[in-house]
Amino acid sequence: MKLILCTVLSLGIAAVCFAAPPKSVIRWCTISSPEEKKCNNLRDLTQQERISLTCVQKATYLDCIKAIANNEADAISLDGGQAFEAGLAPYKLKPIAAEVYEHTEGSTTSYYAVAVVKKGTEFTVNDLQGKTSCHTGLGRSAGWNIPIGTLLHRGAIEWEGIESGSVEQAVAKFFSASCVPGATIEQKLCRQCKGDPKTKCARNAPYSGYSGAFHCLKDGKGDVAFVKHTTVNENAPDQKDEYELLCLDGSRQPVDNYKTCNWARVAAHAVVARDDNKVEDIWSFLSKAQSDFGVDTKSDFHLFGPPGKKDPVLKDLLFKDSAIMLKRVPSLMDSQLYLGFEYYSAIQSMRKDQLTPSPRENRIQWCAVGKDEKSKCDRWSVVSNGDVECTVVDETKDCIIKIMKGEADAVALDGGLVYTAGVCGLVPVMAERYDDESQCSKTDERPASYFAVAVARKDSNVNWNNLKGKKSCHTAVGRTAGWVIPMGLIHNRTGTCNFDEYFSEGCAPGSPPNSRLCQLCQGSGGIPPEKCVASSHEKYFGYTGALRCLVEKGDVAFIQHSTVEENTGGKNKADWAKNLQMDDFELLCTDGRRANVMDYRECNLAEVPTHAVVVRPEKANKIRDLLERQEKRFGVNGSEKSKFMMFESQNKDLLFKDLTKCLFKVREGTTYKEFLGDKFYTVISSLKTCNPSDILQMCSFLEGK
């Protein structure tokens, strides 16, 4: 910091003065003179703020994306297709704030893309070839990118890539005629538009936008209109019963059923920026700007809108006129997660020059956590003749993210993580059963369960009522028996979320490295040490790891009811376990008593659902069928179990729990809430308000959209 020597003459004292730190500057990228003018007005109004604004004008959105990537500008608000482009290499920009819009259902940062048809016309999504179509505009999300990308992805529209001609040419061959404002090169795509022949296909023509595309359908110029879920209610609320939605499963549904009958969720426009230390300054500036100049403020300057402008050149400057506020995007979010799997896939399908070959439909991409799981998964892949392929990540949350992105298909998770995966849009399809093999062939109405228990050494004086200040051992943060249940009970009793202050020290893999709950952890013993990581690289990870932590360092372990039995009496040959006996341990009951390890039905913390395989909803049936085939070969009674055993890994619980007798089918359509049960869902929902993980924050943001 610059020092200035200044003299206070009246007192005759020399003093050292500190100059004010230099102001941070945000460089906003604009793409037109009206937008630059609005930006400069905002700049002038915020000159006295801690963070100031400058404006950088470029010719196009892509020029702005390049400028931000090259550190010549800092931010711009983009629509979904542009945000897709910005997220690709070499730009790698990320969304940091989302525009929020007011709809009849309330404020939201997304909408649904739907296909609207007149009731009584009877055709389905599978009969669109040869029909006439109405679109909001070329390159627009609900009107073009999603419907055309989806039809390409499904193979309905045939297109071999850019070398075979443009996407517009392929669409013109698919529909008999269309109105696609902006598609002036392809005549058939303008044939159904109305107005002056010279301007009827312009981007601001009568049939452009949501209302225009709907009126194209209403006027009989099209058989189907690709719009957003609110369009019919906004344009013909009294006639909505005359229209229906085309669903991707081949059915039709009423207009109000858009949540279950849509082609994709479309994310709002997002402010994108480089993933660097400027992000906080950008959000601080935007937060202050919307506080001073947002909706319902008394300022003459409007950050958003105002809506209802007649001149299209003056519409949507800096932000959409319909925006009512900006909402911070969680830091874990990239453009692919922000846009969502369906929308991202639709756009990818329109960029075949950049696509990798599609994977075979009859195989599964399993997500393995850490090198031990990767090793087992690779052996499974070999004996499965490639029906199972493997991708490896460092932490379980990364599996959830990969499945969300379509980069993996499945992973088996414990109940606490099934909750997180469920918030992230995944569904349970198969669940592990640990006791009764005779039930394996059934599809359970009620999921199988196990008991979460607290275990202490028999020779200690620990009980449930004196745990505060003791040393604790947990399977991992966020897992059911090792975290959710015990911490949920402690949270209910104490009201505190400061769990690392409740115990003197502990090992809860996945905790912050400097937390008390990492102090007992051992790591891998190698380089890097990987201490306190939530994978098998940490010696005290998982059920067996938590028991080992109790044996070597801790006062209490939070584990599953069968863990002690599985690792005592010579069943675990490892040095730390080979001499252990079941009678060395006791259960801690919540009434303060202690009990024999086998009395878990009467002395437990909770009965909880077993681990489950989670997938994206559209993959559920295929993965369920494939896993059934794999289990017939490599399960407990598999025909080829001499080659490989799915449920065996020397007490390490790799990929599945070693105790698993079989995988049973979760009833089709079961939600994660139904699978977890009301009691467990209530406990975990309450607990998750305490310091929610970054992935839960991200998925809660998406779920709230």
UniProtKB/Swiss-Prot annotation:
Disulfide bonds join 29-64, 39-55, 134-216, 179-193, 190-201, 247-261, 367-399, 377-390, 424-699, 440-662, 473-549, 497-690, 507-521, 518-532, 589-603. Residues 26-352, 364-689 form the Transferrin-like domain. This is Ovotransferrin. It holds the Pfam family Transferrin. The keyword Repeat applies. Fe(3+) 1 binds at residues 79, 111, 210, 269. It is found in: Secreted. Hydrogencarbonate 2 binds at residues 475, 479, 481-482. Coiled coil: none annotated. CDD domains: PBP2_transferrin_C, PBP2_transferrin_N. Monomer. Hydrogencarbonate 1 binds at residues 136, 140, 142-143. Belongs to the transferrin family. Expressed in the magnum of the oviduct (at protein level). Fe(3+) 2 binds at residues 414, 450, 543, 611. Transferrins are iron binding transport proteins which can bind two Fe(3+) ions in association with the binding of an anion, usually bicarbonate. Responsible for the transport of iron from sites of absorption and heme degradation to those of storage and utilization. There are two forms of hen transferrin, ovotransferrin, found in the ovoducts and, serum transferrin, secreted by the liver. Serum transferrin may also have a role in stimulating cell proliferation and is regulated by iron levels. Ovotransferrin has a bacteriostatic function and, is not controlled by iron levels. Keywords: Allergen, Disulfide bond, Glycoprotein, Ion transport, Iron, Iron transport, Metal-binding, Repeat, Secreted, Signal, Transport. GO terms for biological process: acute-phase response; antibacterial humoral response; antimicrobial humoral response; intracellular iron ion homeostasis; iron ion transmembrane transport; iron ion transport; response to lipopolysaccharide; response to xenobiotic stimulus. The lineage of its organism: Eukaryota, Metazoa, Chordata, Craniata, Vertebrata. GO terms for molecular function: ferric iron binding; iron ion binding. Its main location: secreted.
